[in-house]
Amino acid sequence: MIKAVVFDLDNTLMDFMRMKRAAVDAAADAMIDAGLNIPKKELVEKIFTIYWKEGIEDQNIFDKVLQKEFGRVDPKILAAGIIGYRRAKDGVMTLYPHVRLTLAGLLKAGVKLGVVSDAPRLAVWLRIVSLELHHYFEHVVTYDDTGKRKPSPEPFKRILELLGVSAKEALMVGDWAERDIVGAKKMGMKTAWAKYGDEFKTVNSGADYELLDTQDVLAIIEKENGRRQCL
């Protein structure tokens, strides 16, 4: 019986890469408007090159790009980029369809809810609260809570302990097969791959279930628990 569902956050509950691309695009426009002499497409590519190398959560991304490409960090250019980024990010941070419907249905069925994210603690909570999801989740585990990223067993162990369930009583939902699915399966959890959020052109997720929509989780719980709980 599934007693708890654990969700990844980015590209599982929220459309993170849509937000990231829009925010970087706006930041590039703002820096160029402030006097940075570089084609926009080239600047965006340089930003993402460093993101992919050093981490998509890098909080000093614009400093690094400016220092690497121009030999100095102009505070006016930097400020313009940060402000442009923040304004765009807040404007396009959105949930995938049916997320609230799904979470409400799970809670109605008596299923505990948690989040495991590789992002820093404050960044995770800013997203959760901004999206008004903080009332749904009993516990949230971030990178700062264990110092380990998925597929390490530590984040999964922590969330299972906090939720008070065994691995076989939990379902992990995530978009990144190599982290979310592999890590959870090694722990003995059931797994559901959020295909709708896949950014890696994954061919075989290895998950027990594949989701085309978040509300597919409700059908999984009904199947696993043997009764229609989530209506």
Q: Could you say what each language-model-derived stretch is?
A:
Residues 1-5, 17-18, 68, 100, ...:
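Asp-based, Mg2+/Mn2+-dependent phosphohydrolase catalytic module
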Residues 2-101, 122:
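N-terminal helical cap/lid subdomain that shapes the substrate entry/recognition surface
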